[in-house]
């Protein structure tokens, strides 16, 4: 419901949404540039990247898109069977990007016993080194509102396998 409200607000402000377009196939790139002052290509993904590691098949290991939608449905007042909740659990989130951050925050808000976030990359510096990174995206430590809620973060972690008893 929140996303629907935001989209309606943006439509009312003049934003035009065209989804499932293949630029260069069913939409001409030159026509886009000629007709619009700004074009946003936002290629999000609902398809996860799996970790081909021993033990991956254990119960309790889930993709973000199997976990996050349940909370959105609950927030919208929907009741859905077989919901995944982090309440009372020790949660590890593998991945330090925006989706990982969403999983961290959702787990904390659901009352997880603990939340640890593993990031493959080494911890970047707090301050960016502009001469080193410009014109690329600056390498500096970013702390999302989800991380501010209390997750432990570990950097330079390579997932080699999973162990457990289902």
Walk through the language-model features, giving the residues of each.
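A Rossmann-like FAD-binding core segment of flavoenzymes
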Residues: 2-49, 62, 72-81, 108-166
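Conserved acidic residues
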Residues: 37, 59, 89
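Short glycine-rich loop/turn motifs that provide flexible caps or phosphate-binding loops at active sites
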Residues: 41-43, 54, 63, 94-96
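A short, gly/pro- and small-residue-rich
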Residues: 52-69
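Short secondary-structure boundary/capping segments
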Residues: 53, 82-84
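Beta1/beta-strand and adjacent pyrophosphate-binding region of the FAD-binding site
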Residues: 85-97
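N-terminal Rossmann-fold NAD(P) dinucleotide-binding loop
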Residues: 100-101
């Amino acid at each position: 419901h929140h996303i629907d409200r935001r989209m309606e607000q943006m439509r009312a402000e003049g934003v035009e949404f065209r989804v499932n377009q293949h630029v260069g196939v069913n939409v001409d790139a030159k026509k886009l540039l000629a007709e619009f002052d700004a074009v946003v290509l936002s290629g999000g993904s609902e398809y996860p990247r799996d970790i081909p590691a021993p033990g991956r098949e254990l119960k309790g290991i889930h993709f973000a898109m199997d976990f996050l939608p349940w909370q959105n449905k609950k927030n919208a007042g929907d009741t859905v069977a077989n919901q995944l909740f982090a309440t009372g659990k020790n949660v590890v989130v593998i991945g330090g990007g925006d989706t990982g951050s969403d999983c961290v925050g959702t787990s904390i808000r659901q009352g997880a016993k603990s939340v640890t976030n593993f990031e493959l990359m080494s911890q970047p510096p707090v301050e960016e080194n502009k001469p080193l990174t410009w014109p690329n995206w600056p390498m500096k430590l970013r702390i999302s509102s989800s991380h501010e809620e209390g997750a432990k973060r570990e950097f330079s972690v390579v997932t080699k396998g999973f162990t457990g008893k289902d």
